[in-house]
């Protein structure tokens, strides 16, 4: 019953993602400057807000729950564009492997880290993560310099002009964009997902 009530209250429309920097903050809205221009984003009272802070590869270990955006290489293997480490309380969030919209052909995998190995791919030293989820597994190469962040709790105090954000939202039939979840960069970073 609670799930049905929550779904009934969720904003209706086409899912959209917005990546950019906050240019203005109002009580119930944000203006976000993206590569395509400025977007006005409605902030409902129940919008979920979290942050990301810089992390290191050494923070990733077997048993952690992570998400990674990757692209397929010519040989069919996956190369990470970014990795985000979830807190234990978020284990299971978006679990699985699916298409993603960071760039053409990109994918998102949210899964448990099964194994971490040191490898060389085309003479580039890096790490190979074996990620396991309910219906399968993926092996993803993490080259040096790949952005790695840690998801942390957040609230509206993170939403300030100049802050980099990733916004999961819906666009209504009237064109209004309503945020469902906002991830804000902490310490000047841009959420890499």
Question: What residues fall within each predicted segment?
Answer:
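Short, flexible, surface-exposed loop segments at domain boundaries
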Residues: 1-193
């Amino acid at each position: 019953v609670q799930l049905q009530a929550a779904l009934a209250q969720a904003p209706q429309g086409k899912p959209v993602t917005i990546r950019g920097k906050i240019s203005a903050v109002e009580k119930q809205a944000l203006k976000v400057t993206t590569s395509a221009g400025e977007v006005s984003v409605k902030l409902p009272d129940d919008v979920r807000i979290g942050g990301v802070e810089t992390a290191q590869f050494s923070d990733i270990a077997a048993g952690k729950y992570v998400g990674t955006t990757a692209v397929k290489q010519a040989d069919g293997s996956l190369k990470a564009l970014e990795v985000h480490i979830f807190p234990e309380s978020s284990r299971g969030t978006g679990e699985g492997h699916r298409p993603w919209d960071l760039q053409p052909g990109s994918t998102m995998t949210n899964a448990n880290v099964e194994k971490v190995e040191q490898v060389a791919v085309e003479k580039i030293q890096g790490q190979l993560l074996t990620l396991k989820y309910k219906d399968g597994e993926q092996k993803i190469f993490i080259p040096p310099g790949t952005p790695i962040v840690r998801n942390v709790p957040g609230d509206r105090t993170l939403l300030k002009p100049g802050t980099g954000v990733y916004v999961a939202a819906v666009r209504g039939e009237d064109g209004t964009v309503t945020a469902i979840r906002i991830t804000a960069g902490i310490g000047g970073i841009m959420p890499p997902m």
